[in-house]
UniProtKB/Swiss-Prot annotation:
This is Large ribosomal subunit protein uL3. Part of the 50S ribosomal subunit. Forms a cluster with proteins L14 and L24e. It comes from Pyrobaculum neutrophilum (strain DSM 2338 / JCM 9278 / NBRC 100436 / V24Sta) (Thermoproteus neutrophilus). It comes from the Archaea. Keywords: Ribonucleoprotein, Ribosomal protein, RNA-binding, rRNA-binding.
């Protein structure tokens, strides 16, 4: 007898409940501990612009195509510099072990577009805030930068920024992280200061929304034969479960599909550039526009629709056999947007 294949559904229970994401800005729940030898941000945020295809030289020694030119699909991310408007110190709460904010410092001068999402004080007392940092730095376990995107520098014609919290890591010393955070106050950070071409990153974004869908599209359930014994329907399950319990979550049911936050691990950075004009098609990216500043090319696909915010971070689960750390050699890049 052959192998018995029983696959009544194709949906994972690990992503329940399948409901709409609470916010279109991704919420990162896990940040890795990396040793970079110097303090740095552990993540970056960019906007999805579209896709191109590139001809690159295969640099994995174990590949049969090693040293030859291969075609790779790449996702283009519009990556304007992030503005650092503050930082926070966290400690561990002794009662439950959760992180708790103990000090916060804001930059003395903030741009006008921050007022679109924050109510700013008339005058920020930085000296008073820094005294609190000095008081609690001995019990601090985490330092996180408060960053704002700059969509007015992107191609989407948007003015209201998104606010995120990105940890500062790379070194174990909290004092070094605090000094680095103070040096960044009121300044901008470009993608080249966070990532390098050739390395792996995790991409986190909210997927495309599909609305309310049936079990065929949502779970890939087999369509029933169209004959008289299936008169109650064809694009449905044979049964929705027993009378009791009344609802079984393992049973495929129609409902919301898409607009879920998802994480894809270990995507390779093909290239990081400063001039978006060199990769933008003549007519611009479809449904996006023109990239004017820094950009990031990611090998493969990235979750989400165009214009959606994508958060990149250092890999939380790096593979045992990582690709070469050197920048891939891009021979040719298409000029037609997908």
């Amino acid at each position: 007898m052959g192998l018995k294949i029983n696959r009544p559904r194709r949906g994972s229970m690990g992503v329940y409940p399948r409901k709409r994401a609470a916010d279109i800005v991704p919420r990162v729940r896990t940040w890795p501990e990396v040793n970079l030898g110097k303090p740095a941000l552990l993540g970056f945020a960019a906007y999805k612009a579209g896709m191109l295809h590139a001809v690159v030289v295969e640099d994995r020694p174990t590949s049969p195509l090693y040293g030859k030119e291969v075609v790779r699909p790449v996702t283009v991310l519009d990556a304007p510099p992030l503005f650092i408007w503050g930082f926070r110190l966290y400690t561990l709460d002794p009662t439950n072990g959760y992180r708790r904010s103990i000090a916060e410092v804001w930059a003395p001068e903030l741009p006008a577009y921050i007022r679109r999402v924050l109510t700013l004080p008339e005058k920020a007392d930085v000296d008073k805030q820094m005294k609190k940092v000095e008081e609690f730095k001995d019990v601090a376990v985490d330092v996180r930068a408060l960053v704002a995107t700059q969509p007015h520098l992107s191609g989407i014609g948007k003015k209201t920024p998104e606010l995120l919290e990105i940890p500062i890591g790379g070194v174990p010393s909290v004092d070094e992280r605090i000094k680095f955070a103070v040096s960044l106050l009121g300044k901008t950070v470009s993608p080249k200061e966070v990532f390098t071409a050739g390395q792996l990153v995790d991409v986190i974004a909210v997927t495309k929304g599909k609305g309310y869908q049936g079990v065929i599209k949502r779970f890939g359930v087999t369509i029933l034969p169209r004959w008289h014994k299936h008169r109650k329907g064809h694009r449905r399950t044979g049964t929705i479960g027993p009378q009791a319990p009344a609802l079984m979550f393992t049973q495929p049911r129609p409902g919301q599909m898409g607009f879920h936050q998802r994480t894809e691990y270990n995507k390779r950075v093909v290239k990081i550039g400063d001039n978006g004009a060199e990769i933008t098609p003549k007519s611009g990216f479809l449904h996006y526009g023109v990239i004017r500043g820094p950009y990031i090319l990611i090998q493969g696909t990235v979750p989400g629709a165009k214009k959606r915010l994508v958060v990149l971070r250092h890999p939380a689960r790096p593979p045992k056999k990582a690709p070469p750390a050197a920048e891939p050699q891009v021979v040719w890049l298409s000029s037609q947007s997908i």
